[in-house]
């Protein structure tokens, strides 16, 4: 594995990320959520993609792609492992969204190219990274109250907002993926909350990918 080459690719791709609002449709009609996981001891990569109407946040479509994993887990290079399955799920959708929430980092990455940014560049769609853990940067401690907020900073640059979406839950790291500003990324995540830790797009993507009870109930109620 030529990590020097991959690192150079990351730096080059990151230079093309657009960190300002360039949505083709604002507000969007459809918002997607994307989540990637691994099965069979990592041999299979699974990507779930859901489509939600906006502003109702009603689930209207879901697809799950499973492909052979082509790259081992290497910290800092996860997007190269995940994006092939995301592209496969993207191609399965009957209609394309105006905005995509990706479970993972956007520019809040040491080389400013998390999976949300990488995927957004590949398909040229506005994306937001919604991550559950910090990958780089520093932030001031948050209060325990829901709504607590702090910028994630690295070398004088704001990479994300750190936001406690729910009491007694760890905060989310909300970042530009591509074609969305960091402030708009936070605003869109906040608009898509329904009382859970995660915004509805990535909450549903996770539920579909892992066949959680919410998804089982949803499928049971479908005609």
From Swiss-Prot:
Protein's name according to its UniProt entry: Endonuclease V
Any GO BP: DNA repair
Keywords: Cytoplasm, DNA damage, DNA repair, Endonuclease, Hydrolase, Magnesium, Metal-binding, Nuclease
Keyword Membrane applies: no
Binding-site residues for Mg(2+), renumbered to this chain: 35, 103
Record keyword Magnesium present: yes
NCBIfam families xrefs: PRK11617.1
Annotated GO MF terms: deoxyribonuclease V activity; magnesium ion binding; RNA endonuclease activity, producing 5'-phosphomonoesters; single-stranded RNA binding
Origin species: Shigella flexneri
The reaction(s) this protein catalyses: Endonucleolytic cleavage at apurinic or apyrimidinic sites to products with a 5'-phosphate
Chief place where the protein resides: cytoplasm
Gene from which this protein is expressed: nfi
Enzyme Commission no: 3.1.21.7
